[in-house]
From Swiss-Prot:
Compartments reported by the entry: Cytoplasm
Pfam family, one: Arg_repressor_C
Organism: Desulfitobacterium hafniense (strain Y51)
Job of this protein: Regulates arginine biosynthesis genes.
SUPFAM superfamilies: C-terminal domain of arginine repressor, Winged helix' DNA-binding domain
Protein name: Arginine repressor
Length: 150
């Protein structure tokens, strides 16, 4: 039953825009599955589903690797302004502290912005680590972030 349910979840996620666990639970119920929000939450965790930005400035569930978050300069600028609390650096690293729960979405936007000097990001709940190459480019990355936050 669990395998069938998770297959149905993947089908729903791939074919519809699902914003909340409750929306997903309702669609599963309509498909004949007896589920609670807690069951759906466990399935989402087990399946490794993620939330990605939509074009409507919202988030939806997606299977990792199947959906590319939209990345525009305006969206990145807005996210930086709204969520970044502090910016620090050390050697070839830039560390952004965000409002809790925002680091992964912002890191994804940075990744998809294709900044040549940023070779990758690592994000937790409220911290993003930008790896910069060469180390001498750290000041220009910080300057770019500062300009976008203005």
């Amino acid at each position: 039953m669990k395998t069938r349910r998770q297959m149905k979840i993947q089908e729903i996620i791939n074919n519809q825009v699902i914003h909340t666990q409750e929306e997903l639970a309702e669609l599963l119920r309509k498909a004949g599955f007896d589920v609670t929000q807690a069951t759906v939450s466990r399935d989402i965790k087990e399946m490794g589903l993620i939330k990605v930005p939509t074009s409507e400035d919202d988030y939806r569930y997606a299977v990792p690797g199947t959906a590319q978050p939209l990345s525009t300069p305006d969206r990145l600028k807005r996210r930086l302004r709204e969520t970044v609390v502090t910016v620090n650096d050390s050697e070839n690293l830039v560390v952004l502290r965000t409002i809790p729960g925002n680091a992964q979405a912002l890191a994804s936007l940075i990744d998809h912005s294709n900044w040549e000097e940023v070779i990758g990001t690592v994000a937790g709940d409220d911290t993003i680590l930008l790896v910069v190459k060469p180390a001498g480019a750290v000041p220009s990355v910080r300057e770019r972030i500062a300009k976008l936050m203005q």
